[in-house]
């Protein structure tokens, strides 16, 4: 994504060297300020029961593959609240503990994805209409059933092994 005009005043931006960044950054000569690129921020969650021996995976958008629960962070909302909100909205589950796992920038959607563990107090799911299907898996089954070559798969593998490696993925 490229930024050509100042979001404050509309002036065409020029590239100017930024000493601290050590590289050229878009600069507005009218506002006398650098303009850093804007990107989306979202959360994805490894939703587990309290024993952390079961993992909830979902299917969405007519796709026939399991992924993690995820959603965008609203303006003014912190990431941890977004985790709780998304799990409650999509699955009607009460989150009792939130733990940060790892982050990864996903260029395809210009999104910084923040991955968390969301521990819930019940496995009694009441999904909303955004969810096509869901299933609780054992840790081993979850690793086998999550979408291959996906950010969800990479985050889940990292959660299970403690080592995060990201491949070129389709989504």
What are these regions (language model features)?
Residues 1, 40, 50, 108-111, ...:
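A generic fold-level signal
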Residues 73-158, 166, 170:
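Unchanged
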Residues 48-89:
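Conserved Nudix-box catalytic region and its N-terminal flanking loop in Nudix hydrolases
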Residues 27, 67, 115:
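Conserved beta-strand segments that form the floor/walls of ligand-binding pockets within enzyme
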Residues 1-3, 164-171:
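Short, Lys/Arg-enriched, disordered terminal segments
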Residues 2-45:
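Acidic, metal-coordinating catalytic segment for phosphate/diphosphate chemistry
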Residues 17, 46-47, 58, 125-128:
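Short secondary-structure boundary/capping segments
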Residues 44-46, 54-56, 115-117:
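Residues embedded in well-ordered beta-strands
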């Amino acid at each position: 994504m490229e930024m050509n005009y100042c979001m404050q005043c509309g002036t065409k931006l020029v590239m100017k060297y930024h000493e601290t960044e050590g590289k050229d950054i878009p600069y507005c000569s009218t506002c006398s300020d650098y303009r850093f690129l804007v990107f989306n921020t979202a959360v994805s969650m490894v939703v587990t029961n309290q024993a952390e021996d079961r993992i909830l995976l979902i299917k969405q958008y007519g796709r026939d593959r399991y992924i993690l629960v995820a959603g965008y962070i609203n303006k003014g909302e912190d990431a941890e609240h977004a985790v709780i909100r998304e799990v409650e909205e999509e699955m009607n589950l009460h989150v009792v503990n939130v733990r940060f796992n790892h982050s990864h920038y996903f260029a395809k959607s210009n999104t910084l994805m923040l991955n968390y563990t969301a521990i819930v107090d019940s496995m009694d799911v009441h999904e909303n209409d955004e969810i096509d299907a869901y299933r609780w898996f054992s840790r081993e089954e979850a690793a086998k059933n999550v979408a291959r070559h996906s950010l969800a798969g990479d985050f889940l593998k990292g959660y299970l092994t403690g080592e995060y490696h990201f491949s070129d993925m389709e989504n």
